[in-house]
């Protein structure tokens, strides 16, 4: 496995670790509605940071975006909006299925769809099936899905042991939402594929290859922001017990604390895709579709590790922790199989 591929896998691990931790600051926000908190974090992660970083990287910010036709930008934006719909469905999936089953089904589906649909759309899948490297990377995807399944099983054992139940369990509704979440969340992978002309144009302007994907986030995350912020703003306007005015009528120190914590959560959310771009740039072009598999499987891995570090599994007993550890090991093996496949 060469150095570039190793670093690509490493950067995806760092990005996934940030994704697994980003909600921690949000949990410390007090006396704010979820909609206000999520909107503040979202404005930072989906609007301020993509625009600020792109303005820093590009020699002429507006000229860069004006150089693309609507036929190039629109699919990128719409795939970003597609991801935004998946993001909203994610929370509803947890509500009706519980954390473990919801995450397992949603992440498993988005891992498969987001990883395999790209080479299918690009007409590369048949080639991958008949080359040693392609076969190994596809085997890695299968092993990763097995690893996610094992971690999901560990979560179910933990919830059963600790008496944790879904807020409003509904198998039929939950499964439908989980499938929708998995498919729509893959929009980020599709958006990155559609944004390749934007990445190439940024590189042609002298932007370092590690950063070449970042200017496309203005469009991708703009689509996601439209859906997420629109959802939050509509609820803030329509739901009687939600009020932005009330949220900002708290004591000034608490407002400042909530703003900073929400902004920190937004920063950590953005960093997952900042390092995703670095990992994506380090992977051989013919295997760039594997970025999504690495990100999502590492997200599950890091989520399990973070849970152990935060002592969320202390009262779960030995068996759930053992199953979780096995799942994490399987995901690590999957990443190595993919790395060897890309290097062959």
Curated annotation (Swiss-Prot):
Its main location: membrane. It holds the Pfam family RhaT. One of its GO terms (cellular component) is plasma membrane. It comes from the Bacteria. InterPro entries: L-rhamnose-proton_sym_RhaT. One of its GO terms (molecular function) is rhamnose transmembrane transporter activity. The chain crosses the membrane at residues 4-24, 38-58, 68-88, 101-121, 131-151, 175-195, 214-234, 259-279, 290-310, 323-343. It is a multi-pass membrane protein. Uptake of L-rhamnose across the cytoplasmic membrane with the concomitant transport of protons into the cell (symport system). Belongs to the L-rhamnose transporter (TC 2.A.7.6) family. This is L-rhamnose-proton symporter. It comes from Klebsiella pneumoniae subsp. pneumoniae (strain ATCC 700721 / MGH 78578).
């Amino acid at each position: 496995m060469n150095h570039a591929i190793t670093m690509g896998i490493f950067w995806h691990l760092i990005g996934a670790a940030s994704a697994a931790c980003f909600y921690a600051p949000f949990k410390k926000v007090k006396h704010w509605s979820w909609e206000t908190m999520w909107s503040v974090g979202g404005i930072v992660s989906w609007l301020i940071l993509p625009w600020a970083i792109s303005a820093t990287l590009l020699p002429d910010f507006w000229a860069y975006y004006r150089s693309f036709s609507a036929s190039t930008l629109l699919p990128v934006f719409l795939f970003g909006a597609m991801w935004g719909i998946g993001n909203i469905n994610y929370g509803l999936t947890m509500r009706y299925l519980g954390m473990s089953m919801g995450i397992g089904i949603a992440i498993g589906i988005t891992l498969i769809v987001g990883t395999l649909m790209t080479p299918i759309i690009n007409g590369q899948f048949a080639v991958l099936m008949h080359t040693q490297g392609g076969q190994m990377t596809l085997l890695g995807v299968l092993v990763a899905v097995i690893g996610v399944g094992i971690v999901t099983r560990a979560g179910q054992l933990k919830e059963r042991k600790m008496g944790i139940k879904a807020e409003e369990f509904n198998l039929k509704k939950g499964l439908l939402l989980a499938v929708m979440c998995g498919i729509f969340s893959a929009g980020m992978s599709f958006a990155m594929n559609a944004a390749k002309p934007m990445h190439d144009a940024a590189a042609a302007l002298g932007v370092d290859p590690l950063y070449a994907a970042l200017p496309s986030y203005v469009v991708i995350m703009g689509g996601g922001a439209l859906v997420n912020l629109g959802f939050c703003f509509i609820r803030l306007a329509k739901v009687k017990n939600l009020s932005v005015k009330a949220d900002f009528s708290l004591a000034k120190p608490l407002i400042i604390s909530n703003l900073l914590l929400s902004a920190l959560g937004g920063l950590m959310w953005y960093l997952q895709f900042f390092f995703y771009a670095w990992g994506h740039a380090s992977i051989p072009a013919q295997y760039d579709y594997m970025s999504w598999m690495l990100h999502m499987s590492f997200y599950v891995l890091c989520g399990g590790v973070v849970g152990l570090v935060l002592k969320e599994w202390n009262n779960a007993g030995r068996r759930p922790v053992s199953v979780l550890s096995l799942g994490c090991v399987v995901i690590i093996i999957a990443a190595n199989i993919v790395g060897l496949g890309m290097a062959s």
